[in-house]
From Swiss-Prot:
Its main location: endoplasmic reticulum. It is an enzyme of class 5 (isomerase). This is Prostaglandin-H2 D-isomerase. The gene is PTGDS. Its EC number is 5.3.99.2. The keyword Cell division does not apply. The lineage of its organism: Eukaryota, Metazoa, Chordata, Craniata, Vertebrata. The active site is at C65 (nucleophile).
Amino acid sequence: MAALHTLWMGLVLLGVLGVLQTRAQAQVSRQPNFQQDKFLGRWFTSGLASNSSWFREKKNALSMCISVVAPSAEGGLNLTTTFLRKDQCETRTLLLRPAETPGCYSYTSPHWGSTHDVWVVATDYEEYALLYTAGTKSPGQDFHMATLYSRTQTPRAEVKEKFSTFAKTRGFTEDAIVFLPKTERCMEEHR
C-alpha cells in the first residue's frame, strides 16, 4: 500500500511544471515566455491522464489535492502537495530542478529513482496550467502524464475541454482522462 501511495504522490507531483527537451518528447510544446514568478502560489490538481497501470486501476478513487509552488534556493521550485491518504492528510515536498529553457524542470522520482521531465505546456497564470510529464519507470517502461492545474476547485468547462483536447493530442484516450472530484478534506492547510 505504501508503494501505491508513493506512486500516487509521484503522479501528482509529476504533473506540476516545466519543459525539458528529451529525445522521446521533442515535440512537446511549452508556454512561450514562461514567467516562473507568476506560476508561484496555490494550485489544485483538477485533471489527470496517465499511461500508468496503477493510475488506470485507481483513478476512480482519487480526489482533488492542493499544491503550493514556491521558489527554491537553486533557482528551481519547491512543490508541496497535500492530499488525502487513508482518511488522513499527508504532505510531501518535491524539488523541481530548472533546465536551461524557462519553465523546464526535472526531478528524481521518489518511487522509481529515475529522472522525470516536466513541461508547462500552457498557462494563463491566473486560472489554469496544462502540464506534461515524461520519464522512464524502468527499462522499457515509459511514463507519461498530463495534468490540469487550476487556481480554483471548480475550473470552467472551457478549461476542462482545453485539458481534454491537450491530453488527447498526447495520445491519451477518453477513458485515461479523469477530472478529480472536489473535496474540502486536506485543503485548509494552504488557504
